[in-house]
Amino acid sequence: MKILFLCNVFPHANVVSGAINVYHRIRLLAQRGHTVGLAAFKTGADDPHIPAVRAILHEMELLPRPVQQNPFRRFPGNLFPILPHDFSVGYDPAMHRLVGSMVDRTRYDVVVAEFSVMGQYLHHNPYLSAVRRVISCHSCLTTSALKAIRLRPYAPKCWRRRLTVQRLRAVEFAMYRSADLILTLTGEERLDLLKYDPDLSIEIVPYGVDTEYFKPAPARDPEDSLIYTGFFAQEPNSDAFIWFARTVWPWLKARHPGLKLYVVGAGVTRGMREAAGNDQRIVITGPVDDVACYLARGRIFICPIRMGTGFRGKILQAMAA
């Protein structure tokens, strides 16, 4: 079978995000003899990993990750957008054309949009020929928005969410209805989508972990440290760190003078750096080539959760390590 994957984050073996699950789907399908292609967004930090991924693919086309404008420059468009914010952050008209040209060139049997934001390139894409369309929903955008509104009802972002959440729901579920199949990672996520539209065709493809890569390190005395991993451009991850740094960390470091906190992953936000301040015991690494070595170093892995939906694959990685 010929399968084209779409991803908003470049998937490779060392990526610290849910895109690592996408990488292993691609790798295992290619090993089984399928013809697999990839269209994805990337940043400069992904460049060292491109050759290894290209080697397992039939073809690969990459575009720079869309750059977000200052929200004040987009006012009032940020209140009344054509596309809801959750989709506009991953929108590039060039990706519409790219997906269409790749499908025509290679005659793919199916296109899999990983993460709901990439489903927009299968829905109302004027360049896309007839092809089976699958959307892999890692988390429901509408449920995530409603949860954020309940958690921080008076935050500036939530005023925008209140104004646009019904529009988000309409766009998200029109997109799902246009697909031939929806994939979720858990049964709970499947039921959540069916709550909005019981007629959706949904299958569950569970999350996995590479136990050859994430495995217990040789016996040694770990450093007195906490480890938190994630792709911090995603608000649930950055919000969780900011909450932990302001609420829990002061209490912990006062009782454990030698304790360190390692924050491992790309997409670190200004709000995260402000929350860390000048604390020398908080180490924000940014992108790393080997997250497993940090998991082996730490005494405790933490995964605070306040927002978002979906499955946290990093918990499986920490358990395996």
List each language-model region with its residue ranges.
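Acceptor-binding helix/loop patch of EC 2.4 sugar-transfer enzymes
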Residues: 8, 67, 71-88, 133-173, ...
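Conserved catalytic-core segment of nucleotide-activated headgroup transferases in glycan assembly
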Residues: 177, 183, 203-297
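N-terminal subdomain of nucleotide-sugar transferases
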Residues: 1-61, 106
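A conserved catalytic-core segment of Leloir-type glycosyltransferases
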Residues: 39-101, 105
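Short N-terminal targeting/anchoring amphipathic segment
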Residues: 99-119, 132-134
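Short alpha-helical segment that forms part of, or immediately flanks, the ligand-binding pocket
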Residues: 292, 313-320
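Short Ser/Thr-rich beta->loop micro-motif in glycosyltransferases that lines
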Residues: 286, 303-310
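Donor nucleotide-sugar binding/catalytic pocket of nucleotide-sugar-dependent glycosyltransferases
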Residues: 132-135, 142, 161-216
